[in-house]
Structures are given as structure tokens and as C-alpha cells.
């Protein structure tokens, strides 16, 4: 099995570019990765990074304590950790946000990734070793006993669903405009959307082309969520469902469509 990479990636990952000290620091950062992640997440959640960004001259530790209502100890732990993480700076007894801290707070992609990893993945990662050895999603048991997460999406806690779909939609929605031009370049009238999820792409299709009929092939649970999301919207009458488990090799694949679209290509791969 070979891995193919674009030339730019080959240049970046084909040779060593770090000095020994840089490599050693990275190794230490990796060893404390979970702490780096959680402290940084809480710096955003508690509003501390935003306070530092909004403050022209920075804030003292006592001022952060006063503004957040957190204990001296809690603020001290987070600010000192953030200093070594690289998201805050310290000068003349005052803390300010670094460039990395600014992006941590303001980059929407960072927020989507952080929510996804904390709410959806974090607890399950503890079972990664079992998952790799057994070839099964062992970490999924923190939420339920389904064969894959897709059977249980509709039953996940509300915040977990929000972060899952937030991640899914952010990575896919930004590609819809270009994708629609390609899909309908050949006068497509019937489209099979494999793994259409909540029907966002299907809704864009029926809005883009007033004649197309879209059939979403997905798990029955997903189709139920799709119907709730599209109910009452213009063009929803041209969106149909075909319930099937794509992992079951015995399930026949629908035919006689002008085009077949896989939404997963926009965010999963």
C-alpha cells in the first residue's frame, strides 16, 4: 500500500526541517497534548482570550479573576499554561493575547474543530488502541452500542449532534456552489445523493435546478432526520428517500439516475 502526495506535501513531509531543539519541543508539546487542548478550550469558553483581545493594554491576573468570577487558582493555572502553550504573552504584569490566541478565538474553523474533538471524539479517543487492534469503533460505547456512529446520530446528546453536524456542514457547505455547477453541467434531472445526511446538499440542488428530483440513499434513521430538516421548505417535494445500509454488501444499489453524488467526499475524505 502506497501513499501518494502532491509535490508540496512531499517537500514538507519527505525530509526533516526541524532543528534538534525544535523537534524536542514538539515532542514535549505532543506529550502534553490533551492538557494543551483542554486549557485552550477553556480559555475560549470562559471568555478569557476575548477579554485579552478586547483589552488595549492587557489585563493583570487579578483583573481576569474579577472579570471572570473564577478563583485565583483557576485563572493562574490557565494563564500560566497558556503562556507556555503560546496563546498569551506576559509583560509588565499584564497578559495579552498572542497571534495564536487571536486565531484560537476568532478562526471559525478552529472553533468547529475544537467543538467536534471535545464533544464528539474526546472520550472515545481513550479506546483508540482497542479500536485499531480490533478494527471496530470501540470508542463509540461512550455514547451507545451501535455498530457505527451513523446508526446512532439521531440519538446522540444534543450538544454532540450540534458539534457533529457543525463540523460536517462547515467543511461541506463551502464547496456547494462549485459542486452544483459540476453536477448540473450535463442537464441532470435525476440525482442519487449517497449518504445525503440531513439533506442540505439536496435542498441546494432543488433550489439550483427547478426540475431535478433528488433521491437520498442513507440509513432510515438519517432519512427521518432529513425529512424533519426539509419539511415545509420549497422544493422538498422533489427530495425522496431510499433507506439502506451502505455497509451491507447484499443491499442492491439504486439505478437509472442521471448522476450519482457522494456528499461525504466534501468532508470525510
Give the positions of each predicted feature.
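Conserved SAM-binding strand-loop segment of SAM-dependent methyltransferases
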Residues: 235-247
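Conserved SAM-binding loop of SAM-dependent methyltransferases across substrates and taxa
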Residues: 198-210
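A short acidic, Gly/Pro-enriched loop at the edge of an enzyme's catalytic core
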Residues: 249-260
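Conserved SAM-binding motif I beta-strand of class I
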Residues: 213-218
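Conserved Class I S-adenosyl-L-methionine-dependent methyltransferase catalytic core
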Residues: 9-54, 66-189
